[in-house]
Amino acid sequence: MSRRHAAGKRVILPDMKYNSILLSRFINNLMKEGKKALAEKIVYSAFNKIEKKHRVDPYQIFNNAMHNVKPHLEVTSVRVGGANYQVPTHVDESRGYALASRWIINAALKRSEKMMIDKLAEELFEASNNRGVAIKKKEDTHKMAEANKAFSHFSPKKMK
């Protein structure tokens, strides 16, 4: 582990079409092997599909989906006296949106539609309506945190 100072957060430029940093982070998470143009094409095509099919603002659907999937609690593993405990902790906003985008992308990849554009469009629409696999993942995370509420006095920050 490095003894120098921690690396600073990198500045992410907002995307060109909607001027949104959150959407830019989502595109970066979707990107594989440095092919950002392809990731942008998939996201913007999914937005067009949402707009044509449901006649709603796709950027609003995206924001609702991210907000609905973003977890408020998660569990972290803490070792106390030779035993590991799953301790519920609050999720800060940055990590919450990172988890939400990861969960939406993974849920979209597992869908049965043929093209990624269709998969992403449907998963975003379902997540904005509090349905779908990504919402289930958030609920499972919250249930896990609720089940381990008894260990919340083991604060992960105090143990280190």
Swiss-Prot record:
Superkingdom as given in the UniProt entry: Bacteria
InterPro entries, per the entry: Ribosomal_uS7, Ribosomal_uS7_bac/org-type, Ribosomal_uS7_CS, Ribosomal_uS7_dom, Ribosomal_uS7_dom_sf
MF-aspect GO terms: rRNA binding; structural constituent of ribosome; tRNA binding
Classification via SUPFAM superfamilies: Ribosomal protein S7 (SSF47973)
Alphabetical list of Pfam families matching this protein: Ribosomal_S7 (PF00177)
PROSITE patterns (alphabetical): RIBOSOMAL_S7
Keywords (A to Z) from UniProt: Ribonucleoprotein, Ribosomal protein, RNA-binding, rRNA-binding, tRNA-binding
Any one of the GO BP annotations: translation
Record's keyword annotation contains Transmembrane: no
Presence of keyword Zinc: no
CDD domains noted in UniProt: uS7_Bacteria
GO cellular component, one term: small ribosomal subunit
Assembly and oligomerization: Part of the 30S ribosomal subunit. Contacts proteins S9 and S11.
Family from the record: Belongs to the universal ribosomal protein uS7 family.
Role summary: One of the primary rRNA binding proteins, it binds directly to 16S rRNA where it nucleates assembly of the head domain of the 30S subunit. Is located at the subunit interface close to the decoding center, probably blocks exit of the E-site tRNA.
Name this protein carries in UniProt: Small ribosomal subunit protein uS7
Source organism (scientific name): Rickettsia canadensis (strain McKiel)
Gene (name only): rpsG
